Amino acid sequence: MGSRKLLIITTALTFLLSTLSPANANNPPRKILSGWLPDYSLARNLPTVEGNLDLIRDISPFWYGLTGENSIKDKYALGKYTTPKEQVIARLKANGILLLPTITDDNNKLVLANLLANPTSRSNIVQTIKALVLKYNYDGIDLDFETFYTQDGRSSWAALKPNWIAFIKELSTALHDQGKLLSVTTPPDFAPETKRAGNWIYSWAEIGPLIDRLRIMAYDFSTTSPGPIGPLPWTEDGVKYAITQMPASKVFLGIPGYGRDWITKVEGVCPKDFTSSVVVGAKAAVVMREAPNLAASNNALPTYNTTNAESTFTYKKTYVDPTNSASFCTASRTVWYPDERSYAARTNLVGKYRLGGIAVWTFGMENTAAITAVRDIAKSIAPDQVIGTLSTDLEEIGYGSTFNLTGTFKLPDKTPVPALNVRFEIKNSSDNNWRTLSAGVTDLAGVIAFPIILGQKSQIRLVSEGSWERTEGKTIEKVISVVPNVSLSLPASIKVATSYTVYGQVLPKVAGIKLVVKQNKKPLGEFTTDASGGFSFEIKAATTGLATYQVVISAGEKNTAAISDEITILVR
């Protein structure tokens, strides 16, 4: 019994622990851009994402709605789009983007609140969401449950709050156990001293330790009457309160890419085709990229309001009966919308408060100048890059054996990076996601070393912890092969012409390892290990003397090839 002898091979891999911007390799921007990708207009919206990969860590396809404790509506499927959803997912994942699809509350008033109050229903919702994430191998989920504040009413919040917190705790555990992320999107909340009407039901302080992202919807300030969509002082107050409730790195500021066009006055009698739509208080949406054309086509001159950090203009529009030119009315309209300066003012809060980033509603609404403004700020707050080397004394080990891994981390100017938290991660054939096997901290020379034991063939990498000052770093992946151990329950001697059952054990204990047993150097049969790594075969010697047995293991995705020592027994 035994395994084949191995050569010790030393390798060194040099890698850059940050994704470099193709435009400027010396100053890659901080990845601060995230946001929502609606199911519609993918032909326009996807290029915004794919053209700015150096700014983006994750996005949220806005595709799902919770309709019951066991049911989720697939908005993409209902749209009957020609491109299969799986193709869109694969396309985004191929670009290295984390996918945290958004699920909204599509129930009627108080339905979700009542479901969360029932422990069984609450658990069912958790499992329903978890199943969705695992089905498509998403990187997590983003909750956008707005019914609490748009329909349920504040009088329901006191009873709802503990159930909401319990739900987030249970969902967090279920997702984190699978290596998945939990993002929660909420309207703003505010410190009591601001005297602003907040949304305390979302319990930022209580859910902060449980979630990975908080996205603040800093928009819809003005809805029924003309005004800024998300005035900057109001927005900043929400940010300032959020970072007192949880780490700033978890906070993402939601930024609108849209504005509104309100009717403030109507003169004359509107033709019948317009009597219901052209009324005081009616409003239409206008997206950033289209607002300048709307102003120009109506001879309006937008002005930028520096206090609110948004643009505004007014104009008049006449609505004429197509069959009677004498029948018309004229509406006075007021427009508020964000532009590139609005994006810049809000993105500057990322650096000011060291936030996780911004989240745009939605990708594709912005103009080119807005993305340029985000990029310029992202470059100005770019974190340091870290360069590392990874070396191992073995590329192939026997089962149960140790190999040594050493990493060295330096800045581009060769300065060592001490006290850097580094994780050693592995991924084998049974893993859907990378998992941490060991962790440590670099010494004064920027060096970290791990003695490692692997049970089966695995990919390995080092990942340095990200911080405001430095990016998270991921090395290239390296494969360490594991040579299985084999044991046989052969007796020291057997009787001639007598059948014996021999049991074998392969370590690691995994199913599906294929092997050949040889008797006197000739194949006795082909076998496959069961779930415990075991196998069995029959022997029967025809003559007295000595008999030899040997096991030859074929290479597979879980193991490398191996040959045991020959075992000799007496046949009497």
Where are these regions (language model features)?
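Enriched for extracellular/lumenal, surface-exposed ectodomains of secreted and cell-surface proteins
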Residues: 454-476, 547-563
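Short flexible loop/turn segments that cap and initiate beta-strands
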Residues: 411-436, 508-523
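Glycine-centered loop-to-beta-strand initiation motif
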Residues: 436-450, 529-538, 545
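Glycan-recognition patch characteristic of GH18 chitinases/ENGases
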Residues: 26-131
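Substrate-binding surface in catalytic domains of secreted glycosidases
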Residues: 69-83, 149-294
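Conserved, mostly hydrophobic/aromatic
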Residues: 59, 143, 171, 214, ...
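Beta-strand-rich domain onsets/edges
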Residues: 380-413, 479-501, 506-507
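Glycan-binding loop/region signatures in secreted carbohydrate-active enzymes
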Residues: 257-346, 378-381
